[in-house]
From Swiss-Prot:
<dbReference type="GO" id="GO:0005829">
    <property type="term" value="C:cytosol"/>
</dbReference>
<dbReference type="InterPro" id="IPR005843">
    <property type="entry name" value="A-D-PHexomutase_C"/>
</dbReference>
<keyword id="KW-0597">Phosphoprotein</keyword>
<keyword id="KW-0479">Metal-binding</keyword>
<dbReference type="InterPro" id="IPR016066">
    <property type="entry name" value="A-D-PHexomutase_CS"/>
</dbReference>
<dbReference type="GO" id="GO:0004615">
    <property type="term" value="F:phosphomannomutase activity"/>
</dbReference>
<feature type="active site" description="Phosphoserine intermediate">
    <location>
        <position position="100"/>
    </location>
</feature>
<dbReference type="InterPro" id="IPR050060">
    <property type="entry name" value="Phosphoglucosamine_mutase"/>
</dbReference>
<protein>
    <recommendedName>
        <fullName>Phosphoglucosamine mutase</fullName>
        <ecNumber>5.4.2.10</ecNumber>
    </recommendedName>
</protein>
<keyword id="KW-0413">Isomerase</keyword>
<dbReference type="GO" id="GO:0009252">
    <property type="term" value="P:peptidoglycan biosynthetic process"/>
</dbReference>
<dbReference type="InterPro" id="IPR006352">
    <property type="entry name" value="GlmM_bact"/>
</dbReference>
<feature type="binding site">
    <location>
        <position position="244"/>
    </location>
    <ligand>
        <name>Mg(2+)</name>
    </ligand>
</feature>
<dbReference type="GO" id="GO:0000287">
    <property type="term" value="F:magnesium ion binding"/>
</dbReference>
<keyword id="KW-0460">Magnesium</keyword>
<dbReference type="InterPro" id="IPR036900">
    <property type="entry name" value="A-D-PHexomutase_C_sf"/>
</dbReference>
<dbReference type="InterPro" id="IPR005844">
    <property type="entry name" value="A-D-PHexomutase_a/b/a-I"/>
</dbReference>
Length: 448
């Protein structure tokens, strides 16, 4: 990660850390890096429903226009919608203004290249170098060489028509409950599932600029679970603010997370001959039960660091077509170049239709191991990982587990924290393992 770019673009509190002045520079320098080899390049911009979206969009547009780029505004649309349309509309770059599942005061800017993929580390480093220069030496076109701005608010419908064709039949006879987090999918998901002839119940579909992710969406699926039970729905689908995550709820009100969704997709794709190299890519945070369920079904797995960008890099490297995270980022690379909540939802409902099985039965084929994650504030993350007493207690606990569970101790990417996570056959055993390690971490490098 760089000075400005994190694992998912530039993020910060809008108008404090992510200011219009910075957004202008990001538009100007980012646009230049991605389009410098093209005459009159086209750049598309989408945003979620945050109140700060208009402010940052205006600044970004100004920066892009100042380089001579032609800018097309998509309005409110999901992140995967921008990724798809960047390639579909032959744009040289796409930009999404969103902070995903974060609270309303945050916002972010992420770029997509002409191929619809997020930027490489090298491209981000090139933009950062320009941002840090004391003098802006980029060309400044004048007169008719300046860029112009246009609107293409029909882009969302073009994207929906594309993902709709990935399912094998309509969803008539199913009652689907949707939670759109008052975010980017608020006007898209209800239209999509109604168009596929499902009966729908909705919540989180009244964005006002201030309520995105507020007690709703993929980080609060327990609210959707109540709606599913109240309405007698067959499935609940919860998206996050920018629509790149999905967490589901089965017909009994049980939460179905990203690991379970990946397993259901992997098993079906293997059975239908669609799973490339018979492999799923996941992160080190996926539940041990996920790996055991894959193994029982003859499917191999590839692990990466936490972050959907690392999952995507491994998928591209190995030629795999399914990957994701427990948090609900599911990447279906045959169809789209990033995590996509609505596309994942379509595939999940399609599997229910094709197998004629309820979601509880499909998800029940994977048994989740009890899990506990504890964050420990430390004085030095690097010292913690090198500390001999900490390494020794981890080794002792792993020996005691004897393969029937696992321990993961890793630093936070953004805070002075060490994350201690364990999975074991029972919650009691799991908790005991974690607390033994936490006590040693606190004693050795804990911050007051």
């Amino acid at each position: 990660m760089g000075k400005y770019f994190g694992t998912d673009g530039v993020r910060g509190v809008a108008n404090k850390e992510l200011t219009p002045e910075l957004a202008f520079k990001i538009g100007r320098f980012g646009g230049y890096v991605l389009t410098k080899d093209t005459d009159r390049p086209k750049v598309i911009i989408g945003r979620d429903t945050r109140i700060s979206g208009h402010m940052l969009e205006g600044a970004l547009v100004a920066g892009l226009l100042s380089t001579g780029a032609e800018v097309m505004r998509l309005g409110v649309i999901s992140t995967p919608g921008v990724a798809y349309l960047t390639k579909a509309l032959d744009a040289q770059a796409g930009v999404m203004i969103s902070a995903s599942h974060n609270p309303v005061q945050d916002n972010g800017i992420k770029f997509f290249g002409s191929d619809g993929f997020k930027l490489t580390d090298e491209q981000e480093a090139e933009i950062e170098a320009l941002l840090d220069k004391e003098v802006d030496e980029l060309p400044r076109p004048t007169g008719t060489n300046l860029g112009q701005v246009s609107d293409y608010f029909e882009g969302g419908q073009k994207y929906l028509q594309y993902i709709k064709q990935t399912v094998e039949e309509d969803f008539s006879g199913l009652h689907i409950a949707l939670d759109c987090a008052h975010g980017a999918t608020s006007s898209l998901a209800p239209y999509l599932f109604a168009d596929l002839e499902a009966d729908i119940s909705t919540m989180g579909t009244s964005p006002n600029g201030m309520n995105i992710n507020d007690g709703v969406g993929s980080t609060h699926p327990e609210v959707l679970a109540e709606l599913v039970k109240e309405k007698g729905a067959d499935i609940g689908l919860a998206f996050d603010g920018d629509g790149d995550r999905l967490i589901a709820v089965d017909e009994k009100g049980n939460i179905v997370d990203g690991d379970q969704i990946m397993f259901i997709c992997a098993k079906y794709m293997k059975e239908t001959g669609q799973l490339k190299h018979n492999t799923v890519v996941s992160t080190v945070m996926s539940n041990l039960g996920f790996y055991k369920a894959l193994e029982a079904n003859g499917i191999t797995s590839d692990k990466t660091a936490v972050g959907d960008r690392y999952v995507m890099e491994e998928m591209k490297r190995g030629g795999y077509n399914l990957g994701g995270e427990q948090s609900g980022h599911i990447i279906l690379l045959d169809y789209i170049t990033t995590g996509d909540g609505m596309l994942s939802a379509l595939q999940l409902v399609n599997i229910m239709k094709m197998t004629k099985k309820p979601l509880s039965e499909l998800a029940g084929e994977m048994t989740k191991f009890p899990q506990l994650l504890v964050n420990v504030r430390v004085t030095d993350k690097k010292l913690a990982l090198e500390n001999e007493k900490i390494k020794e207690i981890i080794r002792v606990v792993e020996e005691e587990m004897n393969g029937d569970g696992r321990i993961l101790v890793r630093p936070s990417g953004t805070e002075p924290l060490i994350r201690v996570m364990a999975e074991a056959p029972t919650q009691e055993v799991c908790d005991a393992y974690v607390h033994r390690i936490v006590e040693v971490v606190k004693a050795e490098v804990g911050a007051e």
